[in-house]
UniProtKB/Swiss-Prot annotation:
GO terms for biological process: amino acid transport; creatine metabolic process; creatine transmembrane transport; muscle contraction; neurotransmitter transport; nitrogen compound transport; sodium ion transmembrane transport. This is Sodium- and chloride-dependent creatine transporter 1. The modification Phosphoserine is found at S623. Belongs to the sodium:neurotransmitter symporter (SNF) (TC 2.A.22) family. SLC6A8 subfamily. Residues 1-60, 109-138, 252-269, 326-341, 416-444, 501-520, 582-635 are cytoplasmic. Its main location: membrane. It is a multi-pass membrane protein.
Amino acid sequence: MAKKSAENGIYSVSGDEKKGPLIAPGPDGAPAKGDGPVGLGTPGGRLAVPPRETWTRQMDFIMSCVGFAVGLGNVWRFPYLCYKNGGGVFLIPYVLIALVGGIPIFFLEISLGQFMKAGSINVWNICPLFKGLGYASMVIVFYCNTYYIMVLAWGFYYLVKSFTTTLPWATCGHTWNTPDCVEIFRHEDCANASLANLTCDQLADRRSPVIEFWENKVLRLSGGLEVPGALNWEVTLCLLACWVLVYFCVWKGVKSTGKIVYFTATFPYVVLVVLLVRGVLLPGALDGIIYYLKPDWSKLGSPQVWIDAGTQIFFSYAIGLGALTALGSYNRFNNNCYKDAIILALINSGTSFFAGFVVFSILGFMAAEQGVHISKVAESGPGLAFIAYPRAVTLMPVAPLWAALFFFMLLLLGLDSQFVGVEGFITGLLDLLPASYYFRFQREISVALCCALCFVIDLSMVTDGGMYVFQLFDYYSASGTTLLWQAFWECVVVAWVYGADRFMDDIACMIGYRPCPWMKWCWSFFTPLVCMGIFIFNVVYYEPLVYNNTYVYPWWGEAMGWAFALSSMLCVPLHLLGCLLRAKGTMAERWQHLTQPIWGLHHLEYRAQDADVRGLTTLTPVSESSKVVVVESVM
């Protein structure tokens, strides 16, 4: 039976006394009774602990993970990296790093969230000394939520402008065009010098209306970061509309989010298939696909190829952001997260590979139409979405239809990644709030404040100098360097501080069997080595940010970027040092105490079953201000 210490209110349960499920006792020492929330005995009385929300169906979780992890990077970055780094040869380092780095950490984050039933911060109660990992992931995902939505705002703007008989970026003569503007030409026009009586060489020096629409109308690009300029109100309204969409996708929690992603995560695949069918029927499409896949074996020995593969894996798998942990925390305790993680990883990488056929069939057509090499039209990132593809659709029949389809797909790809990222941030935030702070509409108000704060910060990115701010966030705040640092410490903490075998046992408790030993080996050895190797390479061969190969950022702009990066990377060592300095006892005693897990209420039955192995377990009633029941394992 449970015994209460009269002095400190701690309930202890010895291993030989526990039979069956362990129920937290009430204030009189008797088991808590009644239906509804589980009772927690406290010196002041019984405290109701609200149950954690769970997915209505497991497919809701699968769709949410697909929507979050499969995003813009799969469509606009992977195909270009594959072409740039040797075509089909790039798949070799990509698959290898996925096996030793991407999939193991992807599985680690989901299973950790499911086991601890907590968001990105409280999930590190598994090893409280390293709770700084949770704060770091919150910082990174906040930065991502802030700048990532700008791509949606631009995409929404292009989508609205697509509903016209003539696309505004297809012709010159608008107020934003310059005298150097020349409308998009086909190869036969150039050969006949039929455009404004200019030769092909002269045409090459002119500016495309697509570029002028992007730079002069959408971005209203100023001279640099030091020239912010005024707000672009049209794009600002699109940004506001996107944040309103995100709010209503997230405000009711996973019950509503899990339904919305059925559309936002699946419809982009329908559009990709439609665009692929249209693309392969165009002249020159086959040449584009060949350029995409043609192997260049000499590239395999280049370190940059392996660095690009590793960075793409960690970025596209959405590792280190804490959102996967938050999504996993809403799973049933016995859900087979191992199978889910493998399936989701395959979907993610498969989508990247498939998107390459869509992109390069269109680029091959565009290269053939303009009589230029594929390298002249191949773009990555915003250049593909807002320059290369808009230019390509102007050469197609019924151009507005294909433009609208593409930007609608772009909007959906980014939207579910965005609102799941916000969900991950809100989950981590609300898990920290004690029960005494609970009030009606707590979640709705928290989501509104988060969206409003991000929107205010985003206003700096819809000014004339906004693109320079966007590039700072993109290059530093959630770069490969910060994600690799985060992933390295996650593996070290779980495998070497908590214990890889111990965590494998915890997973076996959830799914009924131990995962493949490969996962344990990766967490312990291979993955940390890969992460640290790429991290060191990125630091040693660091190159300052340059926009469009022309604009060099001032020293204070680069310092601002490093401040973004270090604000998350320093969370781990600073939190660790702070905890060790505040604790009492010898350094060994402090380490032992601070690395003891803090268990949640759902662990009681599980821990009770192996108490004879793990020793004494204590149920510690915390203050009434806390809504989390903790169990401290004394080992």
